[in-house]
Amino acid sequence: MAVGKNKRLSKGKKGLKKKVVDPFTRKDWYDIKAPSIFETRNVGKTLVNRSQGLKNANDSLRGRIIEVSLADLNKDEEQSFRKIKLRVDEIQGRNCLTNFHGMDFTSDKLRSLVRKWQTLVEAHVDVKTTDGYLLRLFAIGFTKRRPTQVKKTTYAQTAQVRELRKKMFEIITREATSCDLKELVQKFVPEAIGREIEKASRSIYPLQNVYIRKAKILKAPKFDVSKLLELHGDSTDESGTRVTKDFKEPEVLESV
C-alpha cells in the first residue's frame, strides 16, 4: 500500500471560506464644519480609519479638500453655479474645521455665457491679501451693445481688449490687496469686483457678465490655530452669517 496523502480527502479543505470583516467597523465618521461666513455650517461627513499604533486619524484628515456648491452653503439656488473648495486644517473632537481653499464655476454656467457676435475678455492676476495669502484670480467678461448701437455685432478691437484687460488687472489688484482672505471671499458672492470692472470699462467698451470665475490659493501663510478658531467662532453652531448680495454703488473714480 502506498504511503502518502489521500488527495480525495484533502480536496474538501480548499473550499473553506475566510471570515469576512466589514471594513467600516474600523472607521469613524467626522463632521465637516464650514467657516462662519457661510450660512450652513454642517457641510457633511467624512470617513477615516481609527487611530491605531503610530497612525493617527487626525493626520489622515488634515489636508483633505471638500468641494461644495455655494447654493448649499448659503441656501440660495441662484448661487448654484459657484463651487467652493474647503480644506480641513484642524480637528476638534469629531469636528473637522475647514478654511477657504478655492472657488470655481460649473462648466454649464461658463458655456451658457459664451455667445455669438461678442468678444470674450479674460485676465488672470496673482494677488496677496493683507493676511499673507497668495491667490491667482481669473476674471471673465463679454462685450455688449452700446445704448445707441444699431449694428448686430459687438466685436472689440485688439487695442480695446488690451485696455480692458489692463483695467481688470488694476481693479482686481486694488480690491484684493486691500483686504484679508475672509473679506475677499465675501466680495465674490455679490460680485462686487465684477461690477467695479463694468463701471470702469464703460469709457473703453461696455462689458456685461463680468465675473471672478476662479480663485486658486497658491501659497498660504504659516498655520495659526487662533485665526482659524476666530474664523469659525463657536464650532458647535450649525448656522453662520450669510453673505448678503446687496450691492452698494461705489463712488465714481476720476482715475484708476
UniProtKB/Swiss-Prot annotation:
Pfam family membership, one: Ribosomal_S3Ae
Principal location: cytoplasm
GO cellular component, one term: cytosolic small ribosomal subunit
Gene Ontology molecular functions: structural constituent of ribosome
Modified residue annotations for N-acetylalanine: 2
Keywords, ordered alphabetically: Acetylation, Cytoplasm, Ribonucleoprotein, Ribosomal protein
GO biological process, one term: translation
Subcellular location: Cytoplasm
Annotated family: Belongs to the eukaryotic ribosomal protein eS1 family.
Assembly notes: Component of the small ribosomal subunit. Mature ribosomes consist of a small (40S) and a large (60S) subunit. The 40S subunit contains about 33 different proteins and 1 molecule of RNA (18S). The 60S subunit contains about 49 different proteins and 3 molecules of RNA (25S, 5.8S and 5S).
Name of this protein: Small ribosomal subunit protein eS1
Native species: Coprinopsis cinerea (strain Okayama-7 / 130 / ATCC MYA-4618 / FGSC 9003) (Inky cap fungus)
